[in-house]
Amino acid sequence: MATVSTGSLIFIVKKNSPMMSKLVFFWQNREKEFRDFGGFSEKSVYFCDTIDNRKRLILVVINREVLLMTFDAIDQLAVNTVRTLSMDAIQAANSGHPGLPMGAAPMAYVLWNHFMNINPKTSRNWSNRDRFILSAGHGSAMLYSLLHLAGYDLSVEDLKNFRQWGSKTPGHPEVNHTDGVEATTGPLGQGIANAVGMAMAEAHLAAKFNKPGFDIVDHYTFALNGDGDLMEGVSQEAASMAGHLKLGKLVLLYDSNDISLDGPTSMAFTEDVKGRFEAYGWQHILVKDGNDLEEIAAAIEAAKAETEKPTIIEVKTIIGFGAEKQGTSAVHGAPLGAEGIAFAKKAYQWTHQDFEVPAEVTERFAQGLQARGEKAEQAWNDLFAAYQAEYPELAAEYQKAFANEAAQVELEAHELGSSMASRVSSQQAIQQISEQVASFWGGSADLSASNNTMVKAETDFQPGHYEGRNIWFGVREFAMAAAMNGIALHGGTRVYGGTFFVFSNYLLPAVRMAALQNLPTVYVMTHDSIAVGEDGPTHEPIEQLASVRSMPNLNVIRPADGNETNAAWKRAIAETDRPTMLVLTRQNLPVLEGTKELAEDGLNKGAYILSEAKGDLDGIIIATGSEVKLAMDTQEALEAEGIHVRVVSMPSQNIFDEQSAEYKESILPAAVTKRLAIEAGSSFGWAKYVGLAGKTLTIDTWGASAPGNRIFEEYGFTVANATELYKSL
């Protein structure tokens, strides 16, 4: 029997059997049994109902030690401070979403001030901090209020400038823009997949670096989502993956308010969320009253006690709690107005000024989140110092992994006369990079044999083998890319993922978010053209190149042979603040003359002269990928007729666009207007390089089902046609 005394309360753990115990307490000589919140174990949670007007008490059993947790009026004042700061910021901006902050503030407060191990003084520099993602990014005013109260570099003045030009408080959270924000969110559902990626990274790094007595990677990933997030397909893909992977340190707090922008969720969302997530392999916990701080805390403890399953805590809330129109879509996405705010503040019994933070709330955050975070980080620093002494090589590798420095690798060159698909030369590069960059890992959306993404002699990332470097994302392209974003945001690894290029459409929203967040993810997109052949137009990319090239801050590289593929991978792995998309062939490509010597420098400038004209320059043929060989053959045919042309390989338009005016003029002189671009994709975007006087040999229709070489012939990708097209200039 274990006894814990706190004031006039005495708590006793009674062991009824070796496997079972129950908690009782004596209050004025009356015995009251605590309700079991999940079954007694080494880590369990119990709570009892209110007794004699006392607030409900929570007992937490951790390693059979009993801890007391309770909440008081200051905690409730802190919750209301989060609400009022959010309301005031939205009103000042005359723009924003008050419903979520007003309804979800209790769960967010309990999580932040009573559970999360974060240190505002060091912000995102402490690698073992807990992570929090606001997947429902429209609730950003709540996040900013929490960040301010927690002590991050976010002032009341910043809250007053919510959604204004140049402010630290944009409409949706942006990483690297606002101190303490872990991920850029807003497009619903993606934040959940980001959280899955972060939990994957935590599990992988823990398996790789932790040693007995040295759990240097040991943190939780929390995300807050709403009904809309769960309607999005990407959240379902990600939840399925997380359940399979048994990511026990992943916890979703579900703001279940039954309201969407259009009205009640009953109009479109009536499924059994509990049943769905349990089918995925998750633990589901229901909190019936979203204003009950004790019940929320008990649920979070129960979530942390489950180590074999991710947990979704469904918290039943009232959207816009306290507002005159609470519980309706009217409070979802528009300011309440002065009268509406006054009504809500009266409901909260709020007696302070606009944007005011009561001193006792500031003190409560100092005693809670700040003190706990500083203590936790100092304990981790001490642990890591001992780890460095015991495992110096691993410690150095850990520090290097989190430094996010450009990786430099050496790749074996491809010799003239050899031939292989660029997806195969990419696989060789992946293998060599994995041997030189220990933090490098990745996989494919169920196409590893086709994308050639698997690293040989490495284990698979699976439950019980989280050290594995081959990730099986399954047929979940969107979740793959969004989880990759979470992995990259977590830090400590370099991740890549592959699929067919035609399926890039499935994952572009996540690629966009990677580019927006400056994440150095790598996308291996194979089967890049009509050369796919027999599978037909559903699997033959046409518009994809033009689409991805239009995306800011994304390196799109379509290499012409093995040497350009090597150069592309070197560039990709050296990036620290930009994603890269490698567009690779299914069919074999011969190694071209000159690429061994010119490709690396040329690719890093986006375009280069691969073969100069043999006489006075008549014109220029520009090509990418598999069509560079056709350009070279066309040059030879034209040369036989006394027409001297230059062949420019342009593996990356966007990198070329970033070069100096002098370099671009040296490659594409303005005076040379006879230009032909050859690419097995859309003509869209090529006018920029060929000009009004130029022409393109491209494809502005759908592909066909036939052997790839036959399709190329039918679409005019022949030396004869290219020669005549050039001569028509």
Curated annotation (Swiss-Prot):
<feature type="binding site">
    <location>
        <position position="257"/>
    </location>
    <ligand>
        <name>thiamine diphosphate</name>
    </ligand>
</feature>
<dbReference type="Pfam" id="PF02779">
    <property type="entry name" value="Transket_pyr"/>
</dbReference>
<dbReference type="InterPro" id="IPR009014">
    <property type="entry name" value="Transketo_C/PFOR_II"/>
</dbReference>
<feature type="binding site">
    <location>
        <position position="535"/>
    </location>
    <ligand>
        <name>substrate</name>
    </ligand>
</feature>
<dbReference type="InterPro" id="IPR033247">
    <property type="entry name" value="Transketolase_fam"/>
</dbReference>
<feature type="active site" description="Proton donor">
    <location>
        <position position="477"/>
    </location>
</feature>
<feature type="binding site">
    <location>
        <position position="527"/>
    </location>
    <ligand>
        <name>substrate</name>
    </ligand>
</feature>
<dbReference type="InterPro" id="IPR005475">
    <property type="entry name" value="Transketolase-like_Pyr-bd"/>
</dbReference>
<feature type="binding site">
    <location>
        <position position="227"/>
    </location>
    <ligand>
        <name>Mg(2+)</name>
    </ligand>
</feature>
<dbReference type="Pfam" id="PF22613">
    <property type="entry name" value="Transketolase_C_1"/>
</dbReference>
<feature type="binding site">
    <location>
        <position position="257"/>
    </location>
    <ligand>
        <name>Mg(2+)</name>
    </ligand>
</feature>
<feature type="binding site">
    <location>
        <position position="503"/>
    </location>
    <ligand>
        <name>thiamine diphosphate</name>
    </ligand>
</feature>
<dbReference type="InterPro" id="IPR029061">
    <property type="entry name" value="THDP-binding"/>
</dbReference>
<feature type="binding site">
    <location>
        <position position="332"/>
    </location>
    <ligand>
        <name>substrate</name>
    </ligand>
</feature>
<feature type="binding site">
    <location>
        <position position="332"/>
    </location>
    <ligand>
        <name>thiamine diphosphate</name>
    </ligand>
</feature>
<dbReference type="InterPro" id="IPR020826">
    <property type="entry name" value="Transketolase_BS"/>
</dbReference>
<keyword id="KW-0479">Metal-binding</keyword>
<feature type="binding site">
    <location>
        <position position="97"/>
    </location>
    <ligand>
        <name>substrate</name>
    </ligand>
</feature>
<comment type="similarity">
    <text>Belongs to the transketolase family.</text>
</comment>
<protein>
    <recommendedName>
        <fullName>Transketolase</fullName>
        <ecNumber>2.2.1.1</ecNumber>
    </recommendedName>
</protein>
<feature type="binding site">
    <location>
        <begin position="186"/>
        <end position="188"/>
    </location>
    <ligand>
        <name>thiamine diphosphate</name>
    </ligand>
</feature>
<feature type="binding site">
    <location>
        <position position="450"/>
    </location>
    <ligand>
        <name>substrate</name>
    </ligand>
</feature>
<feature type="site" description="Important for catalytic activity">
    <location>
        <position position="97"/>
    </location>
</feature>
<dbReference type="GO" id="GO:0006098">
    <property type="term" value="P:pentose-phosphate shunt"/>
</dbReference>
<dbReference type="GO" id="GO:0005829">
    <property type="term" value="C:cytosol"/>
</dbReference>
<feature type="site" description="Important for catalytic activity">
    <location>
        <position position="332"/>
    </location>
</feature>
<dbReference type="InterPro" id="IPR005478">
    <property type="entry name" value="Transketolase_bac-like"/>
</dbReference>
<dbReference type="InterPro" id="IPR049557">
    <property type="entry name" value="Transketolase_CS"/>
</dbReference>
<feature type="binding site">
    <location>
        <position position="423"/>
    </location>
    <ligand>
        <name>substrate</name>
    </ligand>
</feature>
<keyword id="KW-0786">Thiamine pyrophosphate</keyword>
<dbReference type="GO" id="GO:0004802">
    <property type="term" value="F:transketolase activity"/>
</dbReference>
<dbReference type="InterPro" id="IPR055152">
    <property type="entry name" value="Transketolase-like_C_2"/>
</dbReference>
<feature type="binding site">
    <location>
        <position position="228"/>
    </location>
    <ligand>
        <name>thiamine diphosphate</name>
    </ligand>
</feature>
<feature type="binding site">
    <location>
        <position position="138"/>
    </location>
    <ligand>
        <name>thiamine diphosphate</name>
    </ligand>
</feature>
<keyword id="KW-0808">Transferase</keyword>
<keyword id="KW-0106">Calcium</keyword>
<dbReference type="Pfam" id="PF00456">
    <property type="entry name" value="Transketolase_N"/>
</dbReference>
<comment type="subunit">
    <text>Homodimer.</text>
</comment>
<dbReference type="GO" id="GO:0046872">
    <property type="term" value="F:metal ion binding"/>
</dbReference>
<comment type="function">
    <text>Catalyzes the transfer of a two-carbon ketol group from a ketose donor to an aldose acceptor, via a covalent intermediate with the cofactor thiamine pyrophosphate.</text>
</comment>
<keyword id="KW-0460">Magnesium</keyword>
<feature type="binding site">
    <location>
        <position position="259"/>
    </location>
    <ligand>
        <name>Mg(2+)</name>
    </ligand>
</feature>
